[in-house]
């Protein structure tokens, strides 16, 4: 009996010490779990504020939001590049966000109107081409003005600009679905060429104000034939704000021309997406076509020398700053201007 009782005997002192130690460790673990997020937050804050790649810069830069899609893309890209160049944070106005954000994955933050009204802005006018003085623009609170849309401002950041103007998935997929369904004489095309024909108000403004012309039937025939001579079974996807004129003046008898755009200037996402998803571009005049070609990449044909030498338009516009050097120009026919 004594031997059995002895075998079940357990010292109380060590047992109490064990329970106390285990309890202490458990409560310490619980406390560490509760305070761990605070430690993590402090570490993230420290990394964010001390990182040399994201300094807290003084001031605020923005730009006017004027014109339609092509103009505002040029304004956005110019603000993006010049603010970076001058070491200032960039913000876009709400109306620019409303134009671009439904189409593209832009990242610049929005400056709300209530905030903008309280800021002592310094307006700084830009020409439509890069100048050395724009690398050193003075002022902490600067509003850039003008109609800048030149690769000379932002082409050194091409990869970033293309990323800013990445189409939303649903916009891109709708365009690609349409293109996949196209056929040239029963066969799937090997090459897709976007064709943008700018008409609208330019039909009257160019000859009457700027001593210039818009693209005519002859130019478009030459441009399409240029691609036909170099690519097998191309398809030409035509977008325009003058689709009726295009149907009458672009020869579609070969079965390789598709009049795809809806030509609605107020909702240009569909037309623009179709053009950018093509391999190459035929453009006429205007920033819409310039940006479509810039985003599409590939080879681009454009209408060259479409104003008289004494045109006042050339005081505001430099062709060499608008069209990339590798793009190919076809001379405009200025004879209609010379008759008057």
From Swiss-Prot:
- Residue positions with a glycan: 185, 251, 279, 305
| Extent of the signal sequence | none
**Subcellular location, in the record's words?**
Golgi apparatus, Golgi stack membrane
The reaction(s) this protein catalyses = a beta-D-galactosyl-(1->3)-N-acetyl-beta-D-glucosaminyl derivative + GDP-beta-L-fucose = an alpha-L-Fuc-(1->2)-beta-D-Gal-(1->3)-beta-D-GlcNAc derivative + GDP + H(+); a beta-D-galactosyl-(1->4)-N-acetyl-beta-D-glucosaminyl derivative + GDP-beta-L-fucose = an alpha-L-Fuc-(1->2)-beta-D-Gal-(1->4)-beta-D-GlcNAc derivative + GDP + H(+); a neolactoside nLc4Cer + GDP-beta-L-fucose = a neolactoside IV(2)-alpha-Fuc-nLc4Cer + GDP + H(+); a neolactoside nLc4Cer(d18:1(4E)) + GDP-beta-L-fucose = a neolactoside IV(2)-alpha-Fuc-nLc4Cer(d18:1(4E)) + GDP + H(+)
| Chain segments annotated as transmembrane | 8-28
Instruction: Give a single Pfam family match.
Output: Glyco_transf_11
* Keywords per UniProt: Glycoprotein, Glycosyltransferase, Golgi apparatus, Lipid metabolism, Membrane, Signal-anchor, Transferase, Transmembrane, Transmembrane helix
Topology in membrane: Single-pass type II membrane protein
Q: From which domain of life does this come?
A: Eukaryota
User: Among the record's GO biological process terms, what is one?
Assistant: protein glycosylation
Which GO molecular function terms does the record list? alpha-(1,2)-fucosyltransferase activity; galactoside 2-alpha-L-fucosyltransferase activity
This entry's Enzyme Commission designation comes to 2.4.1.69, 2.4.1.344
Pathway note? Protein modification; protein glycosylation
Recorded GO CC terms? Golgi cisterna membrane
Q: What does this protein do?
A: Catalyzes the transfer of L-fucose, from a guanosine diphosphate-beta-L-fucose, to the terminal galactose on both O- and N-linked glycans chains of cell surface glycoproteins and glycolipids and the resulting epitope regulates several processes such as cell-cell interaction including host-microbe interaction, cell surface expression and cell proliferation. Preferentially fucosylates gangliosides GA1 and GM1 in the antrum, cecum and colon and in the female reproductive organs.
Name of the protein: Galactoside alpha-(1,2)-fucosyltransferase 2
Provenance organism: Sus scrofa
